[in-house]
């Protein structure tokens, strides 16, 4: 299929795959630029290092993704499905390989119906070998987001990969090979939950792929010299090409169906037929239900697209996105946890002071080693008696034992709130953590 929508679909195929296959090979300093290190419980995203305590940012990203999906669906239906969904992307790639090896649809049908021969065997095996190679490469790249990909490549060629790495490479490869090579539209029609609930986000002003029945009916074949209406026929020549090119095999002339992924392939092929017949394009096109009923112009359609529902979705999406970005910009590049030593509530030292013991963890999320200064306040005479400066390696965490005391008898018995202040030397960044100081009654 050739046309404007096929062109944009392939643009997105190329862009998404350049990002997917290329991103793990980029380096940021001495490490991989994007790495989800589950073993060390750290996510590296260029200059950003995230820990389990930063789960709120992942939640925010998921909320943004969901809101974007709602917005795109309300504006133009299953835009994601038709142009950027991995199932669509890899099905397009596998179909392209199939066409290059076996020929167009007619040639593939003839090959399937032909008796067994060396040519048939070679073409089938050649196609599947390319599919399998691409699938394994895809699985390898996927695992490369969780294991440093350069180390993974060395282990792969030296056959030293761990059993779990091998499992996930071939599991993802098998899923790619099966879904894109064989299941294809069955995934969209029966397995994908989005197909079932996406209609709840549609309304009569949502852009969808439509068939202009008033112009196209009654349909029927005719010669190229026949004029529209001359044979009491509409513009549709009943060539069924729109059905043949549809990834899910539906007939758009029967109206919108939940299987439609909004890819526009039927619109492209119909425009090609209209050009050959000398008819106006747009028998199958992106439009809205209200536009079809009221014969709106493109300007009226675009004006109606910015309806209140879309404006609300957009404002919420922008607000959440800005909130997440502001939160990330204000995020301190280190985190602190203070835990009281449960083995001893308090004790009197040889110097006649009352001491409490704490365990303090400092997580340095920066890309360079950092020294931190510790201080405590909240009670008269309260001071730290252990080292007050701690150095932590880049992207590492360190536990230390911290002791604090007050002069004996200077504070009444009970549990007193105190605050530990941890400052990164050479910067204005600091963290304050609350705790308690126990004084026996």
Where are these regions (language model features)?
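Membrane-embedded alpha-helical bundles of multi-pass integral membrane proteins
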Residues: 1-219, 267, 280, 284-318
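Cysteine-centered iron-sulfur cluster-binding motifs in ferredoxin-type domains/subunits
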Residues: 73-88, 180-195, 227-274
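Hydrophobic alpha-helical transmembrane segments in integral membrane proteins
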Residues: 322-346
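Short, solvent-exposed loop/turn segments enriched in Ser/Thr/Gly
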Residues: 353-358, 399, 413-418
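Short solvent-exposed strand-capping/beta-turn motif centered on an Asx-Ser/Thr pair
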Residues: 363-368, 425
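Short acidic, flexible loop segments centered on an aromatic residue
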Residues: 367-381
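Intrinsically disordered, low-complexity Pro/Gly/Ser/Thr-rich segments with frequent PxxP/GP/PP motifs
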Residues: 383-409
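Terminal connector regions
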Residues: 406-441
């Amino acid at each position: 299929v050739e046309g404007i929508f096929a062109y944009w679909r392939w643009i997105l195929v190329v862009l998404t795959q350049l990002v997917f296959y290329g991103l793990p090979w980029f380096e940021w300093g001495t490490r991989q630029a994007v790495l989800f290190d589950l073993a060390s419980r750290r996510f590296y995203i260029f200059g950003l290092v995230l820990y389990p305590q930063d789960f709120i940012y992942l939640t925010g990203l998921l909320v943004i993704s969901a809101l974007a999906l709602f917005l795109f669906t309300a504006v133009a239906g299953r835009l994601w499905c038709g142009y950027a969904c991995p199932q669509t992307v890899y099905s397009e790639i596998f179909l392209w390989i199939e066409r290059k090896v076996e020929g167009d649809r007619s040639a593939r049908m003839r090959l399937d119906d032909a008796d067994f021969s060396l040519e048939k065997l070679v073409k089938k095996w050649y196609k599947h070998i390319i599919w399998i190679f691409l699938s394994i490469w895809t699985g390898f790249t996927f695992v490369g987001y969780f294991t440093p990909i350069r180390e993974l490549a060395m282990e792969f060629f030296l056959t030293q990969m761990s059993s779990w790495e091998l499992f996930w490479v071939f599991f993802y490869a098998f899923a790619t090979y099966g879904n894109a090579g064989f299941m294809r539209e069955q995934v969209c029609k029966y397995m994908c939950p989005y197909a079932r609930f996406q209609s709840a986000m549609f309304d009569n002003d949502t852009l969808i792929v439509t068939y202009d029945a008033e112009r196209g009916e009654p349909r029927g074949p005719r010669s190229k010299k026949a004029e529209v209406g001359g044979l009491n026929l509409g513009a549709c020549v009943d060539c069924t090409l729109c059905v043949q090119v549809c990834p899910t095999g539906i007939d758009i002339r029967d109206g919108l169906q939940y299987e439609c992924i909004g890819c526009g392939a039927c619109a492209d092929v119909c425009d090609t037929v209209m050009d050959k017949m000398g008819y106006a394009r747009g028998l199958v096109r992106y439009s809205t239900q209200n536009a079809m009923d009221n014969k709106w112009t493109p300007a009226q359609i675009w004006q109606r697209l910015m309806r209140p529902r879309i404006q609300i979705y957009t404002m919420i999406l922008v607000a959440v996105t800005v909130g997440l970005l502001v939160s990330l910009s204000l995020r301190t590049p280190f985190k602190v946890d203070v835990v009281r030593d449960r083995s001893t509530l308090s004790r009197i030292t040889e110097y006649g002071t009352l001491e409490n013991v704490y365990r303090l963890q400092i997580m340095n999320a920066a890309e360079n080693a950092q020294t931190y200064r510790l201080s405590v306040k909240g009670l008269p005479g309260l001071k730290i008696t252990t080292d007050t400066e701690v150095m932590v390696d880049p992207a590492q965490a360190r536990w230390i034992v911290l002791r604090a005391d007050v002069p004996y008898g200077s504070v009444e018995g009970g549990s007193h709130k105190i605050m530990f202040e941890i400052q990164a030397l050479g910067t204005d960044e600091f963290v304050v953590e609350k705790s308690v100081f126990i004084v026996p009654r």
